[in-house]
Every structure is written in C-alpha cells, then in structure tokens.
Amino acid sequence: MRGIILAGGSGTRLYPITMGISKQLLPVYDKPMIYYPLTTLMMAGIRDIQLITTPHDAPGFHRLLGDGAHLGVNISYATQDQPDGLAQAFVIGANHIGADSVALVLGDNIFYGPGLGTSLKRFQSISGGAIFAYWVANPSAYGVVEFGAEGMALSLEEKPVTPKSNYAVPGLYFYDNDVIEIARGLKKSARGEYEITEVNQVYLNQGRLAVEVLARGTAWLDTGTFDSLLDAADFVRTLERRQGLKVSIPEEVAWRMGWIDDEQLVQRARALVKSGYGNYLLELLERN
C-alpha cells in the first residue's frame, strides 16, 4: 500500500499566518502539524509516501522531511497548482500509486487513540474503499454519512446545509487501485472541486465501501481554524504532560516499527539535542 499526504491549499481561514508559511508546517504544540498525518500513515505500516503540496510550499516540506531515509521511509513530492479538491490527489499521485492500493490522509487532520495503528493495518490488502465516521456537533462543515437502522451507510453528502446525521467523515481514506480511474472520471462539483465524497459515492453505489465509526476514545482533530489549532495544541500538551510520553513522533514510530536502529535514533536525537524533542528520543533508549 502507498500513502499520500495532501498538504496543499492556501489556508485562508488562518490568514495572515498562512500568508508566509504552509498551514501544515505550523506547530501543534511541540512539533510541525505535518508530523501527525505522517505518523498516522507510518503506524498503518505504510513506508512509501508522497506529499502533495503547492509549488510555493514544497521547499519547506523538503527541508523538514527530506527523502524520509532518516525515518526508514521513502518520501517523494508532487505539487497541486490549484486547490481543485481532495480527489485530485489520486490523479496527481497516479504514478506514485502504480498498481498498489492507497491511503490518503489530509495534512491538517490529527488522529489519536489506543490501538489506532493496529486497527489501520487491517486495510493493507483492501478491496474497495474504507472510510470512517465521527460524531460531531457541526456536521455541516464536513462530508457527512447517513446510517440506516442496521448500521449500514445509506448516503454521503459534502458539507450539507441540512445534514442527515451528525457523523462526519474524517480526512483518512483507504482505497484499492480502482480509485485512480474513479478519480479521473469525476467532474467538478458546484463548488468547483473534484470531491472525495463523489469517489466514496461510487464505491458506495457498487456496494464496496466500508464505513467504520471510529472507536470510542479515539480523537479526531481538524486544525483548520485559529480555535481548532489552539485546541489541538492544548490536547497534545495535556496528553504529553500527564503521560510523560510524546504523541506522533515519526522517529519513535520508525524505531518501534524496526525501520531504524538504535544508532540511527541516537544520530537523529543528537541533531535535536538542544530541544526537549531530542532529549525525549534519547530517553526512549534508556527506558528500553
């Protein structure tokens, strides 16, 4: 399975901050926002990852992440010139996906929960599509899924004025290779975008879309506004201070997955030793 992180867009809801920097490079407490979706893919066992961003922001991501070798993964880059919709990621990333299945995660979405990585690994050999549902108070801001009495998905809508449920679809999607041709066959919506909801609708119509409600205790945070960005930082800060463990550290995930060894972890830690981040990496070895 290949992975794609979509980190494009102009971040207008965070202007003027994002007039000078990509939203996905902003800090969420003690690390760049992009680390959170990156570790989500890594915990799912995905090592071949393409990051899609704007031509203007691509150099910043490359400076931060490089080719991913220090994390035991392969990171490549592609650009989306205009924010023409989430589904365009599969057209842009077609060569990266090749004949494989693919997971798409949005660069401003944070997922946290017990056993999340183990749960996501189930989709490595997917046939069809798999998306998730999460109860929210303001579903009109998201794609929305409606469930029937037996828990089967009945309908999907993109940012409906009158939602049929409170279940939003978070920015994490798994598909088989058919998604490339499905995305290529889409037409722009009334909003002028190639909608991911339309991709999901095709799979739903074919009876090949699995919709799972995220397990109780799992947190999904969208960081697209000033308040939600601060809420996410507060959430991470509270978790880390109470537990003494950090959240969404790519080096830690790579080390625990066996993709980098102790010496590689030490080398990375030394480069960051002046911050608590580097010290935390060194403490991982002492604890184990």
UniProtKB/Swiss-Prot annotation:
Regulation: Phosphorylation by the serine/threonine-protein kinase PknB down-regulates thymidylyltransferase activity.
Cofactor: Mg(2+)
Keywords: Magnesium, Metal-binding, Nucleotidyltransferase, Phosphoprotein, Transferase
GO aspect biological process, one term: glucose metabolic process
Consequence of changing T12A: Significant loss of phosphorylation. Lack of phosphorylation. Decreases activity and negatively affects cell wall formation
PTM text: Phosphorylated on Thr-12, Thr-54 and Thr-197 by PknB. Thr-12 is the primary phosphorylation site.
Entries under Pfam families matching the protein: NTP_transferase (PF00483)
The protein, known as: Glucose-1-phosphate thymidylyltransferase
Organism of this sequence: Mycobacterium tuberculosis (strain ATCC 25618 / H37Rv)
Organism placement in taxonomy: Bacteria, Bacillati, Actinomycetota, Actinomycetes, Mycobacteriales
Gene name, Swiss-Prot/TrEMBL: rmlA
